[in-house]
């Protein structure tokens, strides 16, 4: 996947519309986490150094197709003004002749932040006339919002067909890392997949089975696999409609020579509660009336052994109910093992990212993916509309 390089373009004096992902948590009119804003700074600094006139567009929250003050971009404007060493202006409108005038009046290296794009319902509907209005604001289009690349919205896909289009530095890094992971991983390639529901991860498991040497399964989804093999799972979370597919996936792994592992022991509880009674049980299964809440010590040892020998590691999803301290050990131990590995390590998914932060090892991970749903769809092997529209015509 070859993307044209933003660094090689002459952008002096040109108006550049950058689709960013500034969908940050806001409380009492203040942005409480500025990580997503900070991650776009390399792209913004590049554009400032090139003398571009920068127009930023993002969504925030889920407004219902019209202006809602609680979803205003103003708290983002306050943070952005602190973070960049240039003049930042704010437009209360997204489109229209007044906004076009504001874009033309920008000095080189200056920034104009637009109000929430989703205050127009046409944004999510990718309406052609709205795309044309957005295109009037700029001479060049840049998408630096990988987290929204799986959505074919006006600002993520539609407008890219109307202007010269490029990936921002953050977007390009995500695409390069995830593409490389799937195309030419150094072996052994170990994927660790967790989370509560097998239904939300089954497409990834199927795609990864064709590419990995070891597939380690944890979290609530593991109990559907265990049930499919007639292992007692008590009242653990099971999706009966996925039992036969889970059974077949284990069989297919055996035929293809992939080491697919499921938990051999468990930390169980008598209720889904941080104060529940707990026990450790082995592969004979989970007692009636109890539920699996985390992988057990033998499973941790097995998974850590596979991680130690790996050259490439992908981790998506926790090993247990790690937000409850009693059931966080499996997830934290996996995070620590990955951090000690000399392999190329990629971590994605909000819970896994929270786990590496909780374990204090985020700085030892090669790449932490900001993609969320976009990362999942990319790993499933699906085409992302927001990426497809950035490719040179011969690659589309």
UniProtKB/Swiss-Prot annotation:
Any one GO MF annotation of this record: ADP binding
Binding site for ATP: 201, 292, 323, 349-352
Reactions this protein catalyses: (2R)-3-phosphoglycerate + ATP = (2R)-3-phospho-glyceroyl phosphate + ADP
Enzyme Commission designation: 2.7.2.3
GO BP annotations, alphabetical order: gluconeogenesis; glycolytic process
SUPFAM superfamilies linked: Phosphoglycerate kinase
Binding site for substrate: 21-23, 36, 59-62, 118, 151
InterPro entries attached to this UniProt entry: Phosphoglycerate_kinase (IPR001576), Phosphoglycerate_kinase_CS (IPR015911), Phosphoglycerate_kinase_N (IPR015824), Phosphoglycerate_kinase_sf (IPR036043)
Keyword S-adenosyl-L-methionine applies: no
Keyword tRNA processing tagged: no
PANTHER family: PHOSPHOGLYCERATE KINASE, PHOSPHOGLYCERATE KINASE 1, CHLOROPLASTIC-RELATED
Subunit structure, as described in the record: Monomer.
Protein name, entry field: Phosphoglycerate kinase
Record organism: Leptospira biflexa serovar Patoc (strain Patoc 1 / ATCC 23582 / Paris)
Native organism taxonomy: Bacteria, Pseudomonadati, Spirochaetota, Spirochaetia, Leptospirales
